[in-house]
Curated annotation (Swiss-Prot):
Keywords noted in UniProt: Ribonucleoprotein, Ribosomal protein, RNA-binding, rRNA-binding
Protein name per the record: Large ribosomal subunit protein uL22
The organism of origin for this protein: Methanothermobacter thermautotrophicus (strain ATCC 29096 / DSM 1053 / JCM 10044 / NBRC 100330 / Delta H)
Record-level GO cellular component terms: cytosolic large ribosomal subunit
PANTHER family, per database record: 60S RIBOSOMAL PROTEIN L17
Length: 153
């Protein structure tokens, strides 16, 4: 597998911890909206927010990919939103991995803040579903790459 560089450039890595996940079977559009929402948050607040999204108690505002997205209660200053449960669960796992990396490096986990989080489209896993009369319909699965950098605030 090829070495993947981080989109975030840093000179001194002593005060930061990183984690990434590739080829996650989640929607790239949902991942972009979640990353935008938790970017800059403190680690504990971000984890709590993602857990609330998974329990469908708090929606994620869809600001870019919001065509035909219904309104949700609890969004301040924005109407359209959704509950991307699957994407929130996968991003939460990567966030917990970054926290474990920070703990291993000896950083104070109480002071950690998300200084960089990004998601990029990965390759599409091609598939198909057999249909009547010998035909087939494409059934593709999008993948997503996620990168997280935590730093002490």
């Amino acid at each position: 597998m090829a070495k993947v560089k981080y989109a975030y450039k840093e000179e001194d890595r002593s005060g930061t911890a990183r984690a990434s996940a590739t080829h996650l079977k989640i929607s790239p559009k949902h991942a972009v909206e979640i990353c935008r929402e938790i970017r800059g948050m403190e680690l504990e607040k971000a984890k709590k927010y993602l857990e609330e999204v998974i329990r469908m108690e708090r929606p994620v505002a869809f600001k870019r990919y919001n065509r035909k997205v219904g309104h949700r209660r609890g969004l301040n200053g924005w109407a359209s939103g959704r509950y991307p449960v699957k994407a929130a669960g996968q991003i939460l796992k990567v966030l917990e991995n970054a926290e474990a990396n920070a703990e291993y490096k000896g950083l104070d986990t109480e002071k950690l803040r998300i200084i960089h989080i990004s998601s990029h489209r990965g390759p599409v896993i091609r598939g198909w579903i057999p249909r009547a009369f010998g035909r087939a319909t494409p059934f593709n699965t999008p993948t997503t790459h996620v990168q997280i950098v935590l730093g002490e605030a």
